[in-house]
Amino acid sequence: GRGSFTESFPLFGYDLHDYDSLFAEKLELLLAIRASERVSWSGSHRPSIEDRGVYPRPVQDPLPVWVAIGGTPKSAARAGILGLPLALAIIGGEPARFAPFAQLFRRSAADAGHGPLPFSINAHGFIADDSQQASDDAWPASQLLMNRIGRERGFAPVTREAYDAGHGLHGHTFTGSPQQVIDKILYNHEVFRHDRFLLQIIAGSMDHAKVMHAIELFGTKVAPVVRSEIAKRSATPVADPATSD
């Protein structure tokens, strides 16, 4: 993905105004390297490459390449046109508001002649034995992280009330008991019909044992139920809401 931080631009001597063209060109080069052991390539933001080998080669053939987005329609369309899987990060707001990105991605892929492509939802969250414990455990580390980044970008501090509001069924964080997280993943699947869900567990200054317990709950309590329920849905196809305007 293009990323939401800009520190690398002055570090590598790039102009921030070239933000989009840099990403498009770097992705084009990556795909060329993936497709061929020896590469000849030229672009606008780096010296040309003349018949150079790129090593070591990946074990997977082809190397999996996903396009990650947070809120840029052009990137969703680009992934579909190129026939690449899309990873949608939801870090704020109601997830259903992001359904148009899934629609655009799938429509762009179909228009470009590609079949169904993998699509993932990616979000922050934390799991504990009950919802209050999950929120209480995750809040200090979440507050520290969000407010530090917020200060750098001129955002108002995040309050506990706003943080807790994101834990509801229609909120953006997957924080709660195993059953709450199950319900939320399945609700999002109704909206997006995605193939993969990635949970970024809040860590940072959190107690390591609690993080390990959250991972255990995700693997033993949440994932099996979600897989079972989605298998039932797959056996009974319904209209995909993320492909309908």
Predicted regions and their residues:
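Active-site-adjacent structural elements that line small-molecule/cofactor binding pockets in enzymes
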Residues: 1-245
